[in-house]
From Swiss-Prot:
Documented EC number(s): 2.1.1.-
Protein's GO biological process: rRNA base methylation
Record's keyword terms, sorted: 4Fe-4S, Iron, Iron-sulfur, Metal-binding, Methyltransferase, S-adenosyl-L-methionine, Transferase
Active-site residues, record numbering mapped to chain: C411 (nucleophile)
Name listed for the protein in its UniProt record: Uncharacterized RNA methyltransferase SAS1819
Enzyme category, top tier: transferase
SUPFAM superfamilies found in the cross-reference section: Nucleic acid-binding proteins, S-adenosyl-L-methionine-dependent methyltransferases
Keyword Membrane: no
Molecular function, one GO term: 4 iron, 4 sulfur cluster binding
Amino acid sequence: MQAIAKNDIKTGTVVDLTHEGHGVVKIDRFPIFIPQALINEQIEYKIIKVKKNFAIGKLLNINTRSENRVAPPCIYYERCGGCQLQHLSYEAQLEMKKEQVINLFQRKAHFDNSKINDTVGMTDPWRYRNKSQIPVGKNEQNEVIMGFYRQRSHDIIDMESCLIQDSQHQEVMNEVKSILKDLNVSIYQEQLKKGLMRHLVVRTGYHTDEMMIIFVTNGKKWPQKNAVVEKILDAFPNVTSIKQNINDSHSNVIMGRQSITLYGKDTIIDQLTDSTFKISDQSFYQINSEQTEKLYNKAIEYAQLTGNEVVLDTYCGIGTIGLYMAPHAKHVYGVEVVPSAIEDAQQNATINQCNNTTFVCGKAEEVILQWKAQGIKPDVVMVDPPRKGCDETFIQTLLTLEPKRIVYISCNPATQQRDALLLAEKYQLEEVTPVDMFPQTTHVETVALFNLK
């Protein structure tokens, strides 16, 4: 093989994209991964890291440009780690995400008879995030900075705008930055593990415009608290809720367990089509409301509900998908391991007058067996696990339960593919639909239909 060493300057043609959106150049079948390079581009690059099985390169020049290359509209794109694909046209982003799913399910796992649909995209793939988590820090000049992290680091890029956040969020961010400076609020310094203000979190109701502002602090004592609230209300009189979240752990976890309401309500309200949801500062709620409706509508289509089915909603969170399905089902049973989420789900069921729902706290594999012993037999099981996918014991429980259909929503198609191989013992994977929940990033969500063989 041709010698490859750090700092070498080389040229080559990009032959593929990784799941992280990096261009792939090969030298005698040895891959070099180059951020922001696109397929079919002829490029000049510098080797910056060499490993046993791959190398990392830095793009220097593009000699032949891809027809899918576009100018990134964000002035922070080259430095910020929030987006990875702004240099790729949106149509090509959707195709890339479909290719990721095809590669996982058909090329690697050999689900050759399973249909992979086109990625469901957005008409306007910007300003879609209804929740922003913004780190607060200080620069070398000891000035307050707020923004997002540089890729693969905890270096904060000081920003005034973000094109994938709700526009209200950047207004709040810039106002809060000014308030923190004016009132000389102590700023948390991660390396020293000292200081007070750690993060600003903003949540908005996509359909209601209700807004919650959360200050995450390293400890409860906050001398300027009342003055900050007063200035926030002067700037944003329509704010629904202002909260302080206490996080005195020295970890990467953004929020702590204790929250104090400083102004207004404990929760905000949002809607997904005809369903209404109370959202707390800690609630899991899909980030992209517009795409969530498309995702859930596809899930209902896959569930094939006629009004006579019993639905089991596992990993149910605050009950969003279960309550979305309840009007179309005979009864929905939801199970979730987080107690506060089940409390929210029960309240949301009351708000939506869903009398055909039951929400229980516990491990899904254990609660399912309890329901089975009570004679409860689901026709459809909804699965929407975290990124790590389903526990194998849960999969084995599903296989003994034998529902007619399993509808599996995933934020990590790689673990969904792993679980699909286990389900294949008794289930046929009919089709998978990618949904673009996070445009301009490499993340892809999928919803899959499994039918009992």
